[in-house]
Amino acid sequence: SRGLGDVYKRQILCTLFFGKIANKFAFALDLYYLCSRKCGRIWLLATTEKNAKTALRGFSKPVRLYQITFVFVGIAVFLPSIMYHYYSGEKPMNYLFTSESVSEGHPDKVADQISDALLDEFLAYDPNSKVACETLVTTGQVVLAGEVKSNAYVDLMEVARRVIHRIGYNKSSYKFDADSCGIFSAIHEQSADINRGVERAEAMSQGAGDQGMMFGYACNETDNYMPLSLDLSHLLLTELAVIRREASAMTYLRKGKVTSYLRPDSKSQVTIEYNERNEPVRVHTIVLSTQHDEFVTPADDSKEAQEAADREMLQTIYNDVKQVLLPRVIAQLPERVRTLFDDQLILLVNPTGKFVIGGPHGDTGLTGRKIIVDTYGGKGGHGGGAFSGKDPSKVDPVSYTHLTLPTILRV
């Protein structure tokens, strides 16, 4: 611990650079430090620069009352701050980290999937196709835009409708369905200036259509080397989609038929608590928002009856998420992750209270707006480029296939 010699040196330095008043406050700090470190005998060094040496020998000169008062005033002023910084340094605090995911029916993901399906269709018939396809989806409308150079003919509208139907938007009540939505295409030929940079006689000398920054990241929190918060967010929505298609749980009786009340649009968010060694210690919070049918009919047209029906729907969904979805997800996890779920878990389901209006009717969707969901959930870095609807001459998607994936597999 700090000795009295160090105290004396600090007093002299404070006097030289900051004056006598600063000297007395600095001494008050040193006095507290000596006491807190339990260095044995507690010395009351109420001194000025004139009698510092004699005070160290045991107060051979009389101590003035104002000097003692000044010392204790200094202690009272600085003690709380010193205690906070001193002890917080020895006791690091846990911290929280959150990642989110979105379902296949989220508007932005609908747009991503249409763009990817168009790309796949072009490459299937002409592997040398150059494609940059963007999609916008909104109420009853799909807009396709971008640049393509290919020898293949693709029925753009048929591909888009097929994707929308597979996702589950196949009812007119959704205000966006595969059979009736309008589809407008503004896709045109790729720029010749870009094409001259990507066309090569040899496949191994493929040029890049643009510059870009890409980041790879891997961790040992999960078996697939992805951050735990993101992995759990994905798994929640993947299992929710399975339940929706099975229609054996999270259902209601509609016109004498058991029907799933789940609709395609949903989001999840998982918060993990970490200790000072960056190790996950527990699942802190799960937020899950899922679009649903209006499966409880109000008793009458009054506002009170509608609110009562909304509360009943919310309670049903909450119970099903807690008793059906979570157990199915946890059962798929390794033992070391299962132990992170405890009774203190905060579960929030449809926090706004109702989620009937959703999908592209509720929010406009665009290709490339979920780049953090598509990568590492906020951990690691991101260069800003999206993946969907781009052929291999675009550096954003191809880098994760040829560079990042082999790196992860070697970990």
Go through the PLM ranges and name each one:
Residues 69-92:
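Short, Lys/Arg-enriched N-terminal segments with co-localized hydrophobic residues
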Residues 98, 169, 174-356:
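Glycine-rich, mobile lid/loop segments that gate access to catalytic sites or pores
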Residues 369-371, 376-403:
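C-terminal catalytic subdomain
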Residues 131-134, 140-198:
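Glycine-rich, N-terminal phosphate-binding loop and its surrounding beta-alpha-beta segment
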Residues 2-11, 401-407:
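Conserved small/polar residues in nucleotide/adenosyl-binding loops
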Residues 93-130:
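N-terminal, positively charged regions that mediate nucleic acid binding
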Residues 15, 26-28, 40, 52, ...:
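Short hydrophobic alpha-helical segments enriched in small aliphatic residues
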